[in-house]
């Protein structure tokens, strides 16, 4: 799926995807609002305990849902600190070539990503 930008678009796309004859047993969403739409669709279809879900980036209340939403959490403080360091180096006259800095992520297991596939 592509060109989905909000929770309602995600909800509709996930509903369509899960209505197929051979629906997926797991979903990975790449943005918070898409994850929220996926949660809505799974709950409405009563599949929240049958289809695994892992989202990229944490969001408020992810742990309060049932099951809690498993996410790949970013570290925004480390990202900001790294960006600021590179910016201030450049402002200070650094002529180093562009570089890639990797900021580690963390898998936060809350239950939704650990749902085992089931046969229909």
Residue ranges and their predicted role:
Residues 1-13, 26-36, 56-60, 73-82, ...:
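Hinge/beta->alpha junction and helix N-cap segments in small-molecule ligand-binding domains
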Residues 69-71:
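A short acidic/histidine/glycine-rich donor-binding loop in glycosyltransferase catalytic cores
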